Amino acid sequence: MERHTCRPDVSPLKQMIMKRVKHLLLASCLLPTFLGAQGVASASFLEITPDAQSAGMAGTGLAITDNGSTAIFHNASTIAFSQDVMGASYSYADINKDFGMHSASLFYRIGREGKHGFSVGFRHYKDADFHWQDGAEDHARAWNVEAAYFRNVAKNLSLSLTLRYLQAKAYKDADSKGSVSVDLGASYHRSMGILDEMASWTIGFQAANLGSKLDGQKLPARLGLGGAIDLPFSMDNRV
C-alpha cells in the first residue's frame, strides 16, 4: 500500500515574501552590532581606561594623588596634592588585535607651593578594520584633545575644570564629526597621624563628559565618587 504525501505548492509570490523576511531578519540582527561598533568609535572610547595603573585597579583614579601624569583622564583636581612638580606619560591600550588606543598627557604645577597648575592630554582610538565591496580596507577612528586647570581653593580642597574637543570619522572619506565637552572635578585630601604622618586619605568627585552629541550619539556622561587611603610603610612598600 503506497502512502502519498501532499505538499502544497508555494507560489512565486510567497517565495519572494519569505526571502524578503529572511533578509529583514538578518539585517535586524546585524544592525545592533554595526551601530554598537559606530558607538565605540564615536563616543564610547571615552570610557576606556587609558593607563595601566588605573586599569590594574579596576579603572579607579578619582581619588589617587600619585598618578598626576594621567589624572586628566580621571580627576584633574588630584594633581594639586601630587608630590611631583611636573610629569608626562604615554600609553597604548591594546584592547585586542583589532582595537587600540594611544594616549599621552602631561601636567605642571605652577608656583613655589604648586597650589595650581595645568594639564593637557590626547587620545586616539582606532576601531576594527572592515572591507568595502571592492576589497578596500578601512576603519573608524576617533580622537580628542583636552586641557585642564586645577587649583587649591582651601587647605585640603582642590577643584578642576577640563575642556575637551572630540572628533570622529566613521570611515576614511566620511565627514568629520566634532563635539565639545567638559569635566568638573573636586578632591579633599588629609594626612593621617600614623606612619610619621606620611599616611593620608582622599575623597574625589568627578562629573565627566558633559557636552553635545558626537556623530549623533550622546557622550557617556557620568558622575563618580571615590575614596583612597595611602599607607607608605617604607620607600619601597605602600598600600
Stretches with model-predicted labels:
Residues 16-25:
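Bacterial N-terminal signal peptides that target proteins for export
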Residues 26-33:
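Bacterial N-terminal signal peptides
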Residues 38-239:
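Subset of outer-membrane beta-barrel
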Residues 6-17:
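Short, Lys/Arg-enriched N-terminal segments with co-localized hydrophobic residues
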Residues 4-7, 30:
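Secreted/luminal cysteine- and crosslink-motif detector
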